[in-house]
Amino acid sequence: MTIAVGRVTKEENDLFDIMDDWLRRDRFVFVGWSGLLLFPCAYFALGGWFTGTTFVTSWYTHGLASSYLEGCNFLTAAVSTPANSLAHSLLLLWGPEAQGDFTRWCQLGGLWTFVALHGAFALIGFMLRQFELARSVQLRPYNAISFSGPIAVFVSVFLIYPLGQSGWFFAPSFGVAAIFRFILFFQGFHNWTLNPFHMMGVAGVLGAALLCAIHGATVENTLFEDGDGANTFRAFNPTQAEETYSMVTANRFWSQIFGVAFSNKRWLHFFMLFVPVTGLWMSAIGVVGLALNLRAYDFVSQEIRAAEDPEFETFYTKNILLNEGIRAWMAAQDQPHENLIFPEEVLPRGNAL
């Protein structure tokens, strides 16, 4: 007797197969399973931000005007953080704070938590989209892994930092000038520029920009068979199918310039991936430290000597005084509910004064 072993064919596809077929179909804009997370969250995050910057005031949370309706422009409009008194409330529209009143919800800062949480999940959805597409076309997932850097920075700055502080109030508001104010806040209250994790982040981002410029220029410089014109801009053909730059020539050039050069394309491109992503991750780790109020470098001996000797001052001690000034002025402005009043004689003065 012969037994035929084979796969049982289903007469009708189940719901999962139907959805999988539709979601992963080849179309102009790929949807995918990741799109179920990405597209709704990105839509709500961007929609909330445009709504907030256009219509919603920050008078009730920060005592500020923050919308186009109140006279702000693109650089000064923002979706502001909730009031300090609301601590870490999720500020759900149907929660005990707003009780389903949309106007009250906006006044309390509910749009900020709405944008922050949907924005975080949208970024995660975008990373999953890169994983999904890479798997579909049989690529390695380095794009998705690289995108973990921006996600780490967003989550650490907008979510973990305020969770470590007293409330969402101390997170950055979503706006250009608001982010600048937050940077000054980080400097004044945490001496962020002297933090080694910030230094690694700066080195990563600026180093990546340098590597990108060097790499692009080198490839352009070593192109061949791209046309018969003497001028690169006239001869270069962006639709050229095959790779026609000379790695050997590039290696020879940089060997003469620096004494060392990349001889392997994979190592070169991995290094270009590694530098910025590591920098972003280091910055994110540093911000998590600040959430716990960890200090960076404190050169106390210089501070003591500067306090005792009117003629001794370093760039560090001058910066410390600047930080004290930022704290003294910013705390009173940012937290009017605390009724902070600093007499003139306690405001910081440098030895030069």
From Swiss-Prot:
Binding site for pheophytin a: 130, 143
UniProt subcellular location: Plastid, Chloroplast thylakoid membrane
Phosphothreonine: residues bearing it: 2
Keyword field contains Chloroplast: yes
UniProt-listed SUPFAM superfamilies: Bacterial photosystem II reaction centre, L and M subunits
Membrane topology, as annotated: Multi-pass membrane protein
Pfam family of the protein (one): Photo_RC
Binding-site residues for chlorophyll a PD2, renumbered to this chain: 198
Catalytic activity: 2 a plastoquinone + 4 hnu + 2 H2O = 2 a plastoquinol + O2
Transmembrane intervals: 41-61, 125-141, 153-166, 208-228, 279-295
GO molecular function list: chlorophyll binding; electron transporter, transferring electrons within the cyclic electron transport pathway of photosynthesis activity; iron ion binding; oxygen evolving activity
Role noted for this protein: Photosystem II (PSII) is a light-driven water:plastoquinone oxidoreductase that uses light energy to abstract electrons from H(2)O, generating O(2) and a proton gradient subsequently used for ATP formation. It consists of a core antenna complex that captures photons, and an electron transfer chain that converts photonic excitation into a charge separation. The D1/D2 (PsbA/PsbD) reaction center heterodimer binds P680, the primary electron donor of PSII as well as several subsequent electron acceptors. D2 is needed for assembly of a stable PSII complex.
HAMAP family: PSII_PsbD_D2
Extra facts: 2 of the reaction center chlorophylls (ChlD1 and ChlD2) are entirely coordinated by water.
Assembly description: PSII is composed of 1 copy each of membrane proteins PsbA, PsbB, PsbC, PsbD, PsbE, PsbF, PsbH, PsbI, PsbJ, PsbK, PsbL, PsbM, PsbT, PsbX, PsbY, PsbZ, Psb30/Ycf12, at least 3 peripheral proteins of the oxygen-evolving complex and a large number of cofactors. It forms dimeric complexes.
Family label: Belongs to the reaction center PufL/M/PsbA/D family.
Protein name: Photosystem II D2 protein
Organism whose genome encodes this protein: Sorghum bicolor (Sorghum)
Gene, per the UniProt record: psbD
